[in-house]
């Protein structure tokens, strides 16, 4: 499929879609599953073959029925409502925009979003996403395949500060933090505490303490939330652009024109979302 023409009209549609996603995510308390959708569409990238990645292919039944994507049909259906109002926006852009907004409205860092991804109907083979039962070498194999680094592995793992695992989807149950609708560094704080009643630690979480370089970053992020936010924003942007080469001048213009408005609105919405966080159990099926 052809890449979209990122002109003034397309950028206006992106702005409108961003606004609608903010409202949707705040009202439905669905930030965790929107972030998961963005990650899982992007996380299939293979740098060597240049296949997979954030191309919207996860919308196809062949891919969203992969075991690792269990439950993501909820997020796909929610995005369809936004797509119907803004048909010019590609699914690839929409899913990554949803992930950026999910972090933003729950109090996380601003992530620069550059549109222009093209859609694909070619689905990668199952098995490219991380297996939660594996150790640190598996994480390196998966992330290095995408062209990402150790810092990216640990920073992106911090995204588990949002949401919870569901046994019918992954075989695991429970949230990683006490406030699973708040994006902060508590994932790392809880990880260093060890086992805590009611909180989840996957094998892929625990293994971050077994490798010296991973542990160094865990300890840094646990004590310095600003460092975590800075590195997370950088790593999330890298993940969202795997295999995507935006025009540099257009990308800079988009970033410069949106980051200030994104920042100001995000603070207000984040406060509202966090305030309602205690009701997450009522709406947990929407995560």
Curated annotation (Swiss-Prot):
Coiled coil feature spans: none
Alphabetical list of Pfam families matching this protein: peroxidase
Main location: membrane
Active site positions, chain numbering: 40
MF GO annotations: heme binding; L-ascorbate peroxidase activity; metal ion binding
Entry-annotated residues carrying N-acetylalanine: 2
GO biological process, one term: cellular response to oxidative stress
The record's free-text note on cofactor binding: Binds 1 heme b (iron(II)-protoporphyrin IX) group per subunit.
Chain positions covered by the region annotation Disordered: 46-66
Cofactor: heme b
Domain of life: Eukaryota
Reactions mediated catalytically: L-ascorbate + H2O2 = L-dehydroascorbate + 2 H2O
Residues spanned by motif AKR2A-binding sequence (ABS) required for peroxisome membrane targeting: 281-287
Subcellular location: Peroxisome membrane; Glyoxysome membrane
Enzyme kind, highest EC tier: oxidoreductase
Keywords: Acetylation, Calcium, Glyoxysome, Heme, Hydrogen peroxide, Iron, Membrane, Metal-binding, Oxidoreductase, Peroxidase, Peroxisome, Potassium, Transmembrane, Transmembrane helix
Function in brief: Plays a key role in hydrogen peroxide removal.
Recorded domain comment: The transmembrane plays critical roles in migration to the peroxisome and/or subsequent insertion into the membrane.
Subunit structure: Interacts via its C-terminal region with AKR2A and AKR2B.
Annotated protein name in UniProt: L-ascorbate peroxidase 3
The species this protein was found in: Arabidopsis thaliana
């Amino acid at each position: 499929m052809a890449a979209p023409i990122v002109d003034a009209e397309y950028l206006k549609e992106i702005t409108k879609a961003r606004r609608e996603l903010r409202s949707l995510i705040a009202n439905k308390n669905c930030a965790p599953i929107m972030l998961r959708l963005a990650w899982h569409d992007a996380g299939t990238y293979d740098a060597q073959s240049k296949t997979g990645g954030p191309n919207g292919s996860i919308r196809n039944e062949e891919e969203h029925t992969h075991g690792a994507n269990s439950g993501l049909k909820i997020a796909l259906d929610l995005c369809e409502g936004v797509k119907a109002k803004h048909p010019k926006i590609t699914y690839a852009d929409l899913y990554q925009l949803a992930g950026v907004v999910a972090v933003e409205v729950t109090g996380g860092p601003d992530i620069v979003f550059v549109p222009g991804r093209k859609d694909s109907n070619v689905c990668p083979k199952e098995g490219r996403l991380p297996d939660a039962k594996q150790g640190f070498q598996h994480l390196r194999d998966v992330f290095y395949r995408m062209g990402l680094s150790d810092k990216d592995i640990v920073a992106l793992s911090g995204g588990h500060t949002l949401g919870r695992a569901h046994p019918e989807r992954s075989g695991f149950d429970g949230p990683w933090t006490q406030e699973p609708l708040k994006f902060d560094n508590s994932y790392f704080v809880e990880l260093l505490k060890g086992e805590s009643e009611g909180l989840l630690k996957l094998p892929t979480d625990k293994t971050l303490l077994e490798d010296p370089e991973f542990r160094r970053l865990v300890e840094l992020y646990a004590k310095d939330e600003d460092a975590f936010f800075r590195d997370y924003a950088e790593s999330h942007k890298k993940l969202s652009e795997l295999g995507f080469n935006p025009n540099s001048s257009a990308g800079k213009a988009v970033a410069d024109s949106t980051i200030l408005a994104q920042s100001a609105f995000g603070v207000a919405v984040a406060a509202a979302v966090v305030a309602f966080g205690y009701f997450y159990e009522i709406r947990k099926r929407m995560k």
